[in-house]
């Protein structure tokens, strides 16, 4: 199961956002102005604030995270790191296979004849790794709808829900406007919600 810890955030983010937004009009912006800016899609103002999380997730989700732009990553090394846990899918054959691959990898790390960088090729995508991720508010604002979507993997959706909950608790003036674009989504064949895309 993924875990998330908020370790750093811009101090007094609304003050920063109002100051930045006010530059356009040469006067201090209000919460109402921030709301208007977000609703109009003028999200560049959100780039002046950031949030940093410590995350534990599978290699599979780590790879998905790196597809999102304007996030910065520092990851646990894959060279010589012993594996102790993995994301359990609930599918017996899959989970047993991942556990077996982890054992092979750990044994390879203890084998002096196998270079650690070569042993790393055996790491299963289900293995859990730790990383620190930093993104500005715009990056998180654009990340969340994509990974809160029911089409996202179960693990990544759970991770996104945790991140969203923490951001919403700290800055509801911004993150209450995160919405899922189900009615306008162009993905085809969604089995959860009728979208504008071609249906299967």
Question: For the regions a protein language model found, what residue spans apply to each?
Answer:
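Family-specific signature for flavin-dependent thymidylate synthase
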Residues: 1-200
């Amino acid at each position: 199961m993924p875990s998330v810890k908020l370790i750093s955030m811009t101090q007094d983010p609304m003050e920063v956002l109002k100051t930045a937004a006010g530059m356009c009009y040469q006067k201090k912006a209000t919460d109402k102005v921030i709301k208007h800016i977000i609703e109009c899609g003028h999200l560049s103002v959100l780039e002046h604030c950031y949030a940093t999380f410590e995350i534990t997730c599978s290699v599979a989700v780590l790879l998905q995270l790196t597809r999102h732009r304007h996030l910065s990553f520092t990851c646990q090394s894959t060279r010589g790191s012993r594996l102790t846990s993995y994301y359990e899918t609930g599918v017996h054959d899959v989970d047993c296979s991942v556990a077996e691959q982890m054992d092979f990898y750990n044994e390879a790390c203890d084998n002096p004849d196998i270079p650690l960088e070569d042993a790393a090729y055996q790491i299963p995508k289900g293995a859990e790794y730790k990383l620190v991720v930093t993104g500005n508010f715009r990056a998180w604002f654009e990340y969340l709808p994509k990974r809160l979507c029911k089409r996202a993997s179960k693990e990544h959706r759970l991770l996104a829900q945790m991140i969203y909950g923490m951001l919403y608790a700290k800055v509801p003036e911004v993150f209450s406007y995160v919405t899922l674009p189900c009615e306008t989504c162009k993905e085809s064949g969604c089995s959860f919600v009728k979208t504008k895309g071609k249906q299967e």
